[in-house]
Amino acid sequence: TYRRDDSNLQKIVPGYYYRSDETGYTNGSGCGNEVASDRPMVQKLIVDSLIYWAKEYHIDGFRFDLMGVLDIDTMNVIAERLKEIRPDIYLYGEGWNGGPSSLAEEKRAFKASAKKMPGIGMFNDDIRDTIKGSVFYDDHLGFVNGGTHLENALRYGITGAVAHPQVDYDAYGSRPWAKEPGQSINYVSCHDNYTLWDKLSVSCPEASEEKKKAMNRLCAAIVFTSQG
């Protein structure tokens, strides 16, 4: 949450709504705190809020930032309750967290746990970085801007991170992470990091504008024709 020590949650029941360890608040969000979604009344607060927004405001989809901060059980309860209201509701999020968390790794709503959360989508950062290069390194190249030996990684992304006989999974923990293609949110850029054009410009400073336009079109073609 934006506030921590003086937040309404901390004032209601001090030490309950946030995770902590012997050093104080844990920081799975990267913002100084993380809600303890695995505790019954925290889960209830989250679920009840979502139900209210879905019923009263007719919201037809929810995106969960840093979904890895939340636990698998809570996400499954969310999906179950919201699909009772609207079976075609969209539920997806970032399948990672922003810092060290005290929540056991096997309980986190990570991308690696997607098969335990059917009907919930995850951003596919594998295809994002394969297409244009890592978002963390300016000069890192992807498939469209000159990167090499990326054919298998691209097939992995195009299939929507599900099992396929033409993909070698040894580089990905020997297994695909998605239960079904619909869990893979395919994208090449978003609100974080460089825009696609800026990434292509900084990674290929000698490329002409026409060349970068062609790269941009290839990025779109890959995303639009991938499963997911």
What are these regions (language model features)?
Residues 1-57, 67-86, 90:
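Substrate-binding/active-site clefts of carbohydrate-active enzymes
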Residues 57-58, 227:
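Short loop/turn motifs at secondary-structure junctions
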Residues 79-80, 86-228:
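Conserved alpha/beta catalytic core and glycan-binding cleft of carbohydrate-active enzymes
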